[in-house]
Swiss-Prot record:
Pfam families, A to Z: MinE
NCBIfam families from the UniProt entry: minE, PRK00296.1
Keywords for the protein's UniProt record, in alphabetical order: Cell cycle, Cell division
Superkingdom field: Bacteria
Protein name per the record: Cell division topological specificity factor
Family: Belongs to the MinE family.
Record carries keyword Nuclease: no
Keyword Cell cycle found: yes
GO biological process, one term: cell division
Task of the protein: Prevents the cell division inhibition by proteins MinC and MinD at internal division sites while permitting inhibition at polar sites. This ensures cell division at the proper site by restricting the formation of a division septum at the midpoint of the long axis of the cell.
């Protein structure tokens, strides 16, 4: 019977395929893998504030956003400070 079912089965309609793909996209976005839109601006502002006190290269600042669960968000900020303590001019 499985062979008969194979040959008589209908193909999924394009609407059903599109619906399944859309559900996958929505589920991925709800999972929180994307970073907030304000994160690049926040990184630029943080770099400006840090540079007021210590001269650093933009590559020495790392800002990462992580969503844990539905109600917990973690913003991780790593700054590599130079060994010599030159203040900006």
């Amino acid at each position: 019977m499985a062979l008969l079912d194979f040959f008589l089965s209908r193909k999924k309609s394009t609407a059903n395929i599109a619906k399944e793909r859309l559900q996958i996209i929505v589920a991925e976005r709800r999972r929180g893998d994307t970073e907030p839109a304000y994160l690049p601006d926040m990184k630029r502002d943080l770099l400006g504030v840090i540079c007021k006190y210590v001269q650093i290269d933009p590559d020495m600042l790392s800002v990462q956003f992580e969503q844990k669960g539905d109600d917990i968000s973690v913003l991780e900020l790593n700054v590599t400070l130079p060994e010599n303590e030159e203040s900006p001019k």
